[in-house]
From Swiss-Prot:
It is a multi-pass membrane protein. Keywords: Acetylation, Endoplasmic reticulum, Lipid biosynthesis, Lipid metabolism, Membrane, Methyltransferase, Phospholipid biosynthesis, Phospholipid metabolism, S-adenosyl-L-methionine, Transferase, Transmembrane, Transmembrane helix. PROSITE patterns: SAM_CHO2. This is Phosphatidylethanolamine N-methyltransferase. One of its GO terms (biological process) is phosphatidylcholine biosynthetic process. The gene is CHO2. InterPro entries: Phopholipid_MeTrfase, Phosphatid-EA_MeTrfase_fun. GO terms for cellular component: endoplasmic reticulum membrane.
Length: 869
């Protein structure tokens, strides 16, 4: 059996109980007449179970099926093996066309116009009144006699068929025409499907090699596994959907019953049309004949055409497209991005051999396609001269380096929004940064897969005589499977999900819920499973070349690492750490042995976690023995410093270097000046003594001599010294006086002398015009202010006031010439310290240092980044 009406089950569920055991009701499609469907049986039981009544057509169908084997024997004896194979191949093609085209056309017209049902009603085929006696018939009683005889014959034959098939209690005339038409339709379906199946099996049997060596190998073992799996799929599908969906019942009438998903319908979309044909490929493996494989591919492909043009349109008309608000979330986000950003256009995406969303006004699209064209043409024109070893290294390195680059961007973007910040601080928008990422990611995919295609193609071309045709076709099938997976993934998560939009535009997400529609209903991470099967297909196509195996392993590992260690943690952070069980997972866990293994693993995991937690508690128990105030070192440090000062005063009572109010304030927030009091014995004082400001981390190595430059952060102790260094040093000396025993003074370091960098600093008193240290002050902290960022106006006001005090603002624009210590980097640090964002120097120069533009831009960036948090 090769078909089943499956999409009904996938859209709204599947009946899981026999109609004979529950009270199932049905109604006609157009007239809404309700009725209870009769009990029916599957195809094999109807035709071959001797305990069931058989109609004339069923007997003829059974004889036709059995006769195929006698015909095969007779033709084989008379005309030989090759003729017999082609004879049954032609038969199979005929019945396959009768199935997909014949049944397809019948169902198409039945779906759109209820053609079969209306024909039965028009000609009173299931009515008690004969056609030529029906006063209400739409046909005139003067119709020609042949037509009357024909329809009377059809009427009698159809009624006889149903009576001979159904139990005695079945009242033919009590049921609407829809159910009776469906029962007759089933007979022709039985004939076509069984003939399709039997002729294919005979053709395959005639193609099996005679040598036992050719049969007993790994291919045959894999083929048997696929066949057994195919049988389970068919049996489980019929268990779930029953005859109603198996025979396309909803084209005739609609059942009203409780529907649920179950079994094989949790594993794959359209299982009877997808994994339900794996037996074809299992038989092709056993035969090891590429002709059988091509026939199987034709049969499978025609079934997909039937699904696309017959079943899916009917399902969408009858039940809707099956999408809900959650499944459309990413698509709505794409629309919202386009709506709010008029210069945004959908990104170029490579799907298989085609490109979507090409924009003729976007240079990067030409660059991407041009790269593909150049690589392909170069490979074709220079195929004879290309060294495959060098090409392999090129593919490997390109894939690895580009993956590291992509993964780094995603990781840093997840951790700190690094990529978005990079563009925001340079004056670009959040969406613009996302557009650049879209180009980078798509170009990465296009470049790596183009190189893989070129390398695989040259491998096949250079070693074509050793290539197995069956392996080549199977490899192409795997490539097609990966292409289908990519398309289904993009269909389910839209462009926003395909380009990791929740890494870059999480503020556009309104519902924190992962999609479970489409391919994500069956697999949690389809790109990690099916997203690399095409690469493994190249391994088959190249007859298991070692280099292709290495590339396939690289593709698989990089894919796995990206999903496991970057994508999954980010998804948990954005959507919550909710465990989503895929359809495949549900089905596997439904198997008792696997469920027991899962329970054992969970118990072991719980035991390990509990033991680790207990050990952590024990290792931290010693901390409770420490004094309660042990971690508070501030008061202790103050006491130590006072004791050291007391000792220094006793040794040299007139040596002193203290910051004003240092007991009260040890943290000076810019632009607050720092005033320093100094005292020096008269015999040690030199008019050229000077005081420098240093970072503690730079001077801690030597307490007797300063070995780093002050960088201009210094002041004289006397207004009369260092006359050639300008007024700045004179203005910093605010007081100086001398007595018989000592000289004392006061020096103020304002914004013209201070550092504009957060850190721990100290003052050093130097003897004369040298770097010999006489006194060192208590370390203190200098920090940039935190400006008010409540509103952009308040932020601008505070920023303007600060820049004015620092003397770097003129006509509302930043001018660093006013203070050599407050440059562009200091302004960037001030903004970052206040609002948490960083603007690039290039951007601030581009806006001419306009304080209004800079403050509002920084505030906008903060709002954007806050929305991404």
């Amino acid at each position: 059996m090769s078909s089943c009406k499956t999409t009904l089950s996938e859209m709204v569920g599947s009946v899981t109980k026999d109609r004979g055991t529950i009270n199932v009701k049905a109604r006609t499609r157009s007239s809404n007449v309700t009725f209870k469907p009769p009990v029916t049986h599957d195809m094999v039981r109807s035709l071959f179970d001797p305990t069931l009544k058989k109609s004339l057509l069923e007997k003829c169908i059974a004889l036709a099926i059995i006769s195929n084997f006698f015909i095969c024997y007779w033709v084989f004896q008379r005309f030989g093996l090759q003729f017999t194979k082609y004879f049954f191949l032609v038969q199979y093609l005929f019945w396959r066309i009768a199935y997909n085209l014949g049944i397809g056309l019948v169902l198409h017209y039945q779906s759109h116009y209820e053609t079969l049902t209306n024909c039965a009603k028009t000609h009173a085929i299931f009515s008690k009144i004969p056609h030529n006696k029906d006063a209400n018939s739409n046909f005139s009683t003067n119709s020609n006699s042949f037509s009357e005889k024909f329809w009377n014959f059809i009427r009698k034959f159809c009624q006889y068929e149903i009576r001979s098939k159904m139990p005695k209690e079945y009242d033919l005339f009590a049921y609407p025409e829809e159910i009776n038409v469906w029962l007759i339709f089933r007979q022709f379906v039985d004939l076509i499907l069984m003939q399709d199946f039997v002729t294919y099996i005979i053709y395959v049997y005639l193609s099996i090699p005679y040598s036992w060596v050719q049969i007993f190998n790994w291919r045959s073992l894999l083929g048997v596994i696929l066949i057994l799996f195919n049988i389970w799929v068919k049996l489980d599908a019929h268990r779930v959907v029953k005859d109603y969906a198996w025979y396309w019942g909803d084209f005739f009438f609609l059942e009203e019953s409780e529907l649920v998903f179950d079994g094989v319908f949790n594993i794959s979309p359209h299982p009877m049309y997808s994994i339900g044909y794996l037996g074809y490929y299992g038989l092709s493996l056993i035969c090891n004949d590429y002709k059988v494989l091509l026939v199987s591919v034709f049969g499978h492909y025609s079934q997909f055409l039937f699904l696309k043009y017959v079943e899916n349109p009917h399902i969408e008309r009858t039940y809707g497209d099956g999408t809900d608000s959650d499944s459309q979330m990413n698509s709505r986000i794409d629309d919202l991005i386009s709506k709010e950003n008029y210069d945004y256009s959908r990104p170029l995406i490579n799907m298989g051999l085609s490109f979507n969303n090409f924009n003729k006004l976007r240079f990067t699209d030409y660059f991407t396609i041009g790269t593909v064209a150049a690589l392909m043409l170069g490979a074709i024109m220079n195929a004879r001269f290309i060294n495959l070893n060098y090409l392999f290294i090129t593919v490997f390195v390109t894939k690895l380096v580009s993956w590291l680059f992509i993964s780094t961007i995603l990781y840093k973007q997840s951790q700190s929004k690094w990529f978005t910040r990079l563009f925001l601080e340079n004056g670009y928008t959040q969406v613009y940064s996302y557009e650049q990422w879209q180009f980078i990611y798509n170009y990465y995919l296009v470049l790596t897969y183009t190189l893989m295609i070129i390398y695989t193609g040259l491998q096949i071309w250079s070693n074509f005589s050793n290539i197995n045709n069956s392996q080549l076709i199977f490899g192409l099938i795997l490539v097609a499977l990966q292409t289908w997976c990519d398309k289904e993934t993009r269909l389910a998560i839209s462009d926003f999900g395909w380009f990791y939009g929740d890494f870059f535009l999480s503020n556009y997400i309104s519902t924190r819920k992962l999609t479970s529609q489409g391919i994500y209903r069956y697999l949690n991470h389809p790109e990690a499973v099916l997203g690399v099967v095409g690469v493994w297909g190249t391994v088959l196509m190249t007859n298991f070349a070692v280099t292709n195996i290495i590339l396939a392993v690289l593709w698989t590992l990089t894919n796995f690492i990206l999903v496991k260690f970057i994508e999954t943690p980010h998804v948990n952070k954005i959507y919550g750490k909710t465990k989503r069980v895929s359809g495949v997972g549900k089905t596997l866990l439904g198997l008792k042995p696997l469920r027991q293994v899962s329970d054992i693993v969970n118990r072991i995991e719980n035991i390990i976690i509990k033991s680790l937690v207990d050990e952590s508690k024990n290792s931290n128990g010693g901390a409770e023995l420490l004094p309660k105030n042990y971690q508070d070192n501030k008061e202790w440090n103050i006491l130590i410093q006072e004791a050291m000062d007391s000792v220094a005063t006793r040794l040299s009572p007139y040596c002193e270097l203290k910051i004003e109010n240092e007991q009260i304030e040890t943290n000076f927030v810019l632009p607050t000046p720092v005033t320093l009091n100094w005292k020096m014995p008269i015999e040690l004082y030199n008019g050229d003594d000077w005081i420098g400001l240093y970072k503690v981390i730079d001077t801690r190595a030597d307490r007797e001599k300063t070995r780093v430059g002050s960088g201009g952060h210094w002041s004289a102790t006397s207004k009369d010294s260092y006359m050639n260094h300008g007024l700045r040093h004179k203005e910093s000396v605010t007081e100086i006086k001398a007595t018989e025993k000592y000289v004392q003074g006061k020096v103020t370091f304002d914004t013209s002398l201070l550092y504009f960098e957060n850190g721990i600093y100290e003052f050093r008193y130097h003897s004369g015009n040298s770097h010999k240290v006489l006194l060192i002050s208590t370390p203190f902290e200098i920090s940039l202010p935190v400006l008010n960022t409540t509103t952009p106006e308040l932020f601008e006001k505070d920023l303007t006031e600060f820049l004015t005090k620092v003397n770097v603002l003129k006509d509302g624009k930043f001018r660093p010439l006013g203070n050599k210590f407050f440059g562009m980097d200091s302004l960037k640090q001030l903004i970052k310290n206040s609002i948490g964002v960083e603007l690039s120097s290039e951007y601030m120069r581009r806006v001419n240092g306009d304080a209004h533009v800079i403050s509002h831009r920084a505030w906008d960036i903060k709002q954007t980044l806050d929305s991404l948090a």
